[in-house]
C-alpha cells in the first residue's frame, strides 16, 4: 500500500493531516531554496502557518494568505461555500495578528450549475466582505465543462496588515485557550456527506449548524490589548484541534498537555463522532480560535473574551517542557488516565472546507 500511496494522489493527501504535511514537504518545500521560502525576515513556507508575513519599510508586516474552498455540499446549515471562502481567509489573516483589508477571489463553476445557486453563493461571499469592511480588489471567473468539476470551487487571497505578526511558537508555561465549541462544522458536513436516517436525525433534532464566521470582533481587540502575550493563534480547520496542537508541540519542541473534560464539545457532536469512531478533536471548526497565552494574563484574557461575546472560551491545557514527550500532545482523559493525541491520518471528512 505504501508504494501505491506514493504513486498516486489520494484524498488523504488533502485532508490537512499527516499525509498533507508529507506531500507538501516532498513536492514543494524540499524543492524551494531556503532563501526563497520567505521575503526578508518575514514568514513564509519555511514555517507551518496559514499565512505569510512580508516586512514593509514602515516596520509593519503585510499578511497574505490563500485558500481553495471545495466544501461538499456547497450549502449547509449555518452557511454556504461563499460565507466559508470569505470567512476562512479573513480568519487566517486574523490569526497572524493582522487586520484584514482586502481580498481577491477565483471562482470556477461547472457548466450547468444553477444560476440562482451561484447568485446566492456570491451574495453570501460579498455580504461577508461588506459586513467586515473588506475590499474585493480583483479576481477570476471560469467555467469547466460538465462532469469535469463538481459544482463550484472558490479560491480566495486574503490581505492584511500587522504591527507585529503572531508567529506560532508556544512557550513553556503558556495556557492553551479555545474560544468556543469545537467540531461543529466538521460534524455538520460529515452528516450531510454520509446521509441516512441517523445523520439527518442529528441535524434535525439538534439543529446543529456550522460555526462558520469571521473572528474579527474577537481577534482585533484581543491582539490590540494582549498581542504581545499571545504566542500562537490558529483556527482549527482541517485536522481540527488535534492538528493545531500537534503542529505547535512539534515546532516548539514541547509537550502540550490538555484536559479532555475542559474541551468545549457539544454533546450531540461528541455522540455523533463516537458513533462513527471519530475523535471529535479531528473535526474542523470554522469559527473558533485556539490561542497559546502567557500564563500571567490567562485569566484576564479569558474574562475579556467573555466580554466580547465568546462565553464558552476556556483554558483546555498548557505547554510543558519534556525530554521524553517533546513534540507530542498528551490528553488527560475524563477517566483520569493519559493518552497521546495523535495528529489526524487518512481522510476522515473529504471536502470539509
Residue ranges of each PLM-predicted region?
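Helix-biased detector of long, well-ordered alpha-helical tracts
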Residues: 1-353
Amino acid at each position: 500500500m505504501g508504494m501505491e500511496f506514493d504513486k498516486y494522489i489520494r484524498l488523504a493527501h488533502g485532508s490537512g493531516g499527516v499525509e498533507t504535511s508529507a506531500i507538501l514537504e516532498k513536492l514543494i518545500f524540499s524543492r524551494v531554496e531556503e532563501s526563497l521560502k520567505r521575503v526578508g525576515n518575514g514568514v513564509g513556507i519555511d514555517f507551518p502557518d496559514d499565512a505569510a508575513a512580508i516586512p514593509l519599510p514602515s516596520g509593519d508586516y503585510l499578511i497574505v494568505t490563500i485558500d481553495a474552498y471545495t466544501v461538499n455540499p456547497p450549502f449547509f446549515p449555518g452557511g454556504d461555500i461563499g460565507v466559508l471562502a470569505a470567512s476562512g481567509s479573513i480568519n487566517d489573516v486574523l490569526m497572524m495578528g493582522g487586520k484584514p483589508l482586502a481580498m481577491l477571489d477565483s471562482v470556477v463553476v461547472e457548466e450547468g450549475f444553477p444560476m440562482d445557486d451561484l447568485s446566492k453563493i456570491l451574495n453570501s461571499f460579498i455580504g461577508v466582505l461588506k459586513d467586515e469592511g473588506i475590499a474585493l480588489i480583483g479576481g477570476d471567473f471560469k467555467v469547466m465543462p460538465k462532469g469535469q468539476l463538481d459544482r463550484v470551487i472558490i479560491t480566495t487571497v486574503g490581505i492584511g496588515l500587522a504591527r507585529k505578526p503572531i508567529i506560532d511558537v508556544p512557550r513553556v508555561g503558556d495556557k492553551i485557550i479555545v474560544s468556543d465549541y469545537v467540531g461543529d462544522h466538521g460534524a455538520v458536513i460529515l452528516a450531510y456527506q454520509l446521509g441516512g436516517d441517523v445523520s439527518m436525525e442529528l441535524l434535525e433534532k439538534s439543529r446543529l449548524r456550522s460555526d462558520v464566521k469571521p473572528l474579527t470582533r474577537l481577534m482585533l481587540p484581543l491582539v490590540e490589548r494582549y498581542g504581545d502575550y499571545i504566542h500562537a493563534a490558529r483556527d482549527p480547520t482541517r485536522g481540527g484541534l488535534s492538528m493545531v496542537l500537534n503542529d505547535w508541540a512539534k515546532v516548539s519542541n514541547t509537550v502540550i498537555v490538555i484536559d479532555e473534560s475542559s474541551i468545549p464539545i457539544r454533546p450531540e457532536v461528541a455522540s455523533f463522532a463516537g458513533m462513527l469512531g471519530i475523535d471529535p478533536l479531528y473535526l474542523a471548526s470554522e469559527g473558533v480560535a485556539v490561542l497559546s497565552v502567557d500564563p500571567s494574563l490567562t485569566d484576564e484574557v479569558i474574562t475579556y473574551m467573555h466580554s466580547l461575546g465568546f462565553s464558552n472560551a476556556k483554558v483546555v491545557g498548557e505547554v510543558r517542557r519534556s525530554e521524553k514527550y517533546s513534540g507530542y500532545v498528551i490528553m488527560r482523559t475524563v477517566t483520569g488516565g493519559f493518552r497521546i493525541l495523535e495528529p489526524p491520518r487518512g481522510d476522515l471528512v473529504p471536502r470539509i472546507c
